[in-house]
Curated annotation (Swiss-Prot):
Gene3D superfamilies listed in its UniProt record: 3.40.50.12280
EC number: 7.1.1.-
Primary subcellular site in the record, as a coarse category: membrane
Protein name (Swiss-Prot/TrEMBL): NADH-quinone oxidoreductase subunit B 2
Organism of this sequence: Cytophaga hutchinsonii (strain ATCC 33406 / DSM 1761 / CIP 103989 / NBRC 15051 / NCIMB 9469 / D465)
Binding site for [4Fe-4S] cluster: 44-45, 110, 139
Record's function text: NDH-1 shuttles electrons from NADH, via FMN and iron-sulfur (Fe-S) centers, to quinones in the respiratory chain. The immediate electron acceptor for the enzyme in this species is believed to be a menaquinone. Couples the redox reaction to proton translocation (for every two electrons transferred, four hydrogen ions are translocated across the cytoplasmic membrane), and thus conserves the redox energy in a proton gradient.
Membrane topology, as annotated: Peripheral membrane protein
GO biological process terms held by the UniProt record: aerobic respiration; electron transport coupled proton transport
Cofactor binding description: Binds 1 [4Fe-4S] cluster.
Length: 181
């Protein structure tokens, strides 16, 4: 048949009011429902983000009730709009100030690929200077799309191992962007 072995639950952790789980699962659940976004908005997508934060869409339902305007307190960097090459070092500095774990969302066509601005002065995607976890398409994306992007970050936050940030793969990713810990 199959040589797959199903892990048995540990003894002594059953009964009313008890459950058996891993520390990764508990911390993932807490991270998933307590994301603090840092908006880095420069263009039209920033307007759509303001609509997303309004009462019509109620982003608080998704655990992102409190936007942070300090990188040291933020979990999710939402980059929205056109990023000029002169702004690149500022964006990277903001990213480096964020504490681990951190996630980056490129909201809209301009942040993802430069959008319609294919010029020498516009960064053709923020993934050239910082690692991006989620891309939200659109010009500008609708609030529903931004919420869907945040829900994707929630999925990443809930399933990410506590040890992933210490893995050789993650360190290689940071080295690719020349980011020191």
């Amino acid at each position: 048949m199959s040589d797959i072995k199903i892990e048995e639950k540990p003894d002594g952790l059953e009964g009313p009011g008890f459950f058996a789980t891993s520390l990764d699962s508990v911390i993932g659940l807490a991270r998933k429902n307590s994301l603090w976004p840092l908006p880095f908005a420069t263009s039209c997508c920033g307007i759509e983000f303001m609509a997303t934060m309004a009462s019509t869409y109620d982003i608080a339902r998704f655990g992102a009730e409190r936007p942070s305007f300090s990188p040291r307190q933020a979990d999710v960097l939402l980059v929205m709009g056109t990023i000029a090459k002169k702004m690149g070092p500022v964006l990277r500095h903001v990213y480096e100030q964020m504490a681990e774990p951190k996630w980056v969302v490129a909201v809209g066509a301009c942040a993802s690929s430069g959008g319609i601005f294919d010029t020498y002065s516009v960064l053709q995607g923020i993934d050239r200077i910082i690692p991006v976890d989620v891309y939200v398409p659109g010009c500008p994306p609708r609030p529903e799309q931004i919420i869907q992007g945040l829900m994707r970050v929630q999925d990443l936050a809930s399933t990410e191992s506590l040890r992933r940030r210490e893995s050789p793969e993650y360190k290689a990713l940071l080295a690719k962007y020349e980011i020191e810990e």
